[in-house]
A protein has these predicted regions:
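Acidic, Mg2+-coordinating active-site environments of NTP-dependent enzymes
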Residues: 51-173
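Conserved nucleotide-sensing/catalytic segment adjacent to the nucleotide-binding pocket
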Residues: 6-47
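Short beta-strand-centered segment that lines the nucleotide-binding/catalytic pocket of NTP-utilizing
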Residues: 1-4
Length: 173
């Protein structure tokens, strides 16, 4: 964890303690955190409100059987924690390809923004028909649809995490 040029922590910093350390730093105005299942179950989120919550996966059975989480429905209850603290005027960004995640759309406050690779995904198509916001990949470019307009943002291959567009699971998330 770094703030400006100063390193605060080294190692696995995805838990609530790291979030608290960052938020308490006097130079921090905004931050992005990973709120994983383990940290949420052990100590909570590490923050009590947020402007944006992003939920990428539940239905793939990742981490089931750990920490007494046996079913996707139980994991839903853990992962919705971030959605529950979105402020009014904020947003919850949800993976349309995971039906359990997409089911979080009506929960809490803030706008639900759905994302998927396929612009023809039924939930993306519905969101676009309603003039709501959706994010998808079209012709190799990450695109945001809102209010009947499609705005190309960046070619997938230019996003470092996708390794030139060759890491499909990173593109999906």
């Amino acid at each position: 964890v770094e703030v400006g040029e100063r390193r605060l922590e080294i190692g696995d910093c995805a838990g609530p303690k790291s979030a608290e350390n960052v938020l308490l730093h006097p130079d921090v105005e905004s931050a992005v955190f990973e709120a994983g299942r383990g940290g949420i179950l052990r100590e909570g989120l590490g923050f009590d409100r947020c402007d944006v919550a992003i939920v990428t996966n539940i239905g793939e059975a990742d981490h089931l059987g750990q920490s007494d989480i046996q079913t996707p429905e139980q994991m839903f209850m853990v992962k919705r924690s971030a959605v529950d603290v979105v402020l009014p005027g904020g947003a919850k960004v949800l993976k349309a390809d995971d039906p359990i995640v997409a089911d979080m759309a009506p929960l809490g406050r803030g706008e639900a923004i759905l994302f998927a690779i396929d612009p023809a995904h039924p939930l993306i198509a519905q969101r676009r028909a309603e003039n709501g916001r959706a994010v998808f990949v079209e012709d190799g470019v990450i695109t945001v649809a809102e209010g009947g307009w499609d705005t190309p943002v960046v070619p997938v291959a230019e996003v470092p995490l996708t390794h030139g567009g060759r890491a499909p699971f990173q593109i999906e998330n």
